[in-house]
Amino acid sequence: MKESKLLPFLRSQTQGELLARLFLNPDREFTLSALARAIGSSIPGVHHEVERLYNAGYINERREGRNRLVRARMDSVIVEPLTTLLALSYGPIPVIEAALTGAKGITQVFIFGSWAKRYSGETGGVPNDIDLGVIGSASTDELEDLLEDAKKILGREIDIKKFTTSSWNEGSSMIDEIKSSPHYFLKIK
């Protein structure tokens, strides 16, 4: 089991990422397979963590055909402090994905810098600002507007670096450095 580097008192990275998906998206229901895809884990691993959370009373579930849909229970006294911890430690991926889903003019989005290093398993302190690369035609002003609430939720600045598709493909010293360092592509729909 891969240990958590972002919030080390959690049992595993899977547990932290699962909690972040659920509690930072409280209005959404997830199937176990969607959760597994989103966090890059196996369905049995997600099933195990979901069972623990359900049995402890932290999530709700319902069935829709063969699908088991789960969502965070927001009526517990632990929700506010847990959500704050998750936003500060695991938050950038699910919060930014939610903020940019459906946005026009975005081809790809990725996190790089110290947050990407933590996601790739490098140890170190909790990162400060979030380095976000955006490939596409959306303007920086549009992106800033879309990410305003995400900044508040995360309690961090988001430093946006914009690239056109052609500039990303052609490369530059900065792009080459990003490509050769840890970077994490987000799943934007």
PLM regions with names:
Residues 2-51, 55-108, 116-127, 135-189:
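Catalytic core of pol beta-like nucleotidyltransferases
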Residues 113:
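Active-site glycine-centered loops adjacent to acidic/histidine catalytic or metal-binding residues
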